[in-house]
Amino acid sequence: MRVLVGGGTGFIGTALVQLLKARGHEVTLVSRKPGPDRITWEELASSGLPPCDAAVNLAGQNILNPLRRWNEAFQKEVLDSRLETTQMLATTISKAPQPPKTWILVTGVAYYQPSLTAEYDEDSPGGDFDFFSNLVTKWEAAGKLPGDSTRQVVVRSGVVLGRGGGAISQMLLPFRLGLGGPIGSGHQFFPWIHISDLVGILAHSLEARHVHGVLNGVAPAPTTTNAQFAKALGAALGRPAFIPLPSAVVQAVFGRERAIMLLEGQKVVPRRTLATGYQYSYPKLEDALKDAVA
């Protein structure tokens, strides 16, 4: 299978490309920089979609970059990096003489409203209560194709755990020093997924023709709280993890609106993901963290 991957040079993209190549697929990246087996976004816009059997978009500016202030300029960057790349791929797919058979977009569980009681599956409502839920709604709308000639899949990802990037890379130093702990109250749900399972779900969605619609890209461990995650990460490192990070500090670093992503959470279940027949490699948090910090 020839697969076109937008944003394929990041943490998730690198893992996906490795898995697809290991399974015998050909991969072309769409990125800002030219290179072997790559096209640029400018080339995609001017020349259209290269011949491919499937397309995946992973592109998007890191929202939780602590070095960037949460102001209008950065919010626009966060929006544009997702909407413009998604819209460009969707447009070139719809205009292609021979469109790909499959189109996969990775968004986020921020679509669902944070709650200490509600449980969300792929059919649950959401998408209209704050900046991030509205972002996911616009993002998924930008990727929607007319008609049904191309099979469409949306994977709403949780926090991605794995070696060499993602959430773990930002947390390791304080936890290794024994200074880690829950964020805020620690009671908020923490929807997570191991990198191997997220890219596994993407590969499964590419290869299994019966898969379509929205899938929740989270582990089947929906009751994990932030405090439980912190305790498990400390245990994986052999370090204590009981020093909480106060809400006020999180809000000071990330801004009040962006801090919601860390101080609040959702109980998300992968009901449809499991129903597709996908089998998780890391369904348990302890095993996922042991691998991620190895």
Model segments located where?
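Mid/C-terminal beta-alpha module of Rossmann-like enzyme folds, strongest
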Residues: R2, A208-R256, K290-A294
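C-terminal amphipathic/interface module of NAD(P)-dependent oxidoreductases
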Residues: I260-A294
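NAD(P)H-binding glycine-rich loop region in Rossmannoid oxidoreductase-like domains
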Residues: G35-M88
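Alpha-helical substrate-binding/gating segment
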Residues: L172-G180, Q188-T223
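N-terminal Rossmann NAD(P)H-binding glycine-rich loop of SDR-like oxidoreductase domains
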Residues: V3-R23
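NAD(P)-dependent short-chain dehydrogenase/reductase
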Residues: D130, G147, V154, G158-F189, ...
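Conserved Rossmann-fold NAD(P)-dependent oxidoreductase catalytic core, especially the SDR/UDP-sugar
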Residues: Q87-F129
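Active-site Tyr-X1-5-Lys
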Residues: D128-Q152
